[in-house]
């Protein structure tokens, strides 16, 4: 499937051009992080086979692992039933979280 066909399946309008993207470990199923993608970051993710996101605070694209070396290699990309959320299954090199934890979801509330 080409990039145009993929982009047409995704509703970027609901979130002002951004869609929440869940990153999950391909082998274990562990949820590693949540980030946001725009159309350009999704295209770069598909082209490079590594995850790219839109930083809402810095207002720029970023390639996960470009600074730390903790790249996420894309194994599969899934879309939810409403077309407004992505699930990307990855092979994670090193920790996913900037704190050094494997997952960003390391704090238990209940």
Curated annotation (Swiss-Prot):
GO molecular-function terms, A-Z = magnesium ion binding; phosphoribosyl-AMP cyclohydrolase activity; zinc ion binding
Q: Which chemical reaction does it catalyze?
A: 1-(5-phospho-beta-D-ribosyl)-5'-AMP + H2O = 1-(5-phospho-beta-D-ribosyl)-5-[(5-phospho-beta-D-ribosylamino)methylideneamino]imidazole-4-carboxamide
Instruction: From the record, give the cysteines joined by S-S bonds.
Output: none
List keywords of the entry alphabetically: Amino-acid biosynthesis, Cytoplasm, Histidine biosynthesis, Hydrolase, Magnesium, Metal-binding, Zinc
- What is the UniProt remark on how the cofactor binds and its stoichiometry? Binds 1 Mg(2+) ion per subunit. Binds 1 zinc ion per subunit.
Q: Which InterPro entries match?
A: PRA-CH, PRib_AMP_CycHydrolase_dom, PRib_AMP_CycHydrolase_sf
Tell me, what does this protein do in biology? Catalyzes the hydrolysis of the adenine ring of phosphoribosyl-AMP.
Name of the molecule in the record: Phosphoribosyl-AMP cyclohydrolase
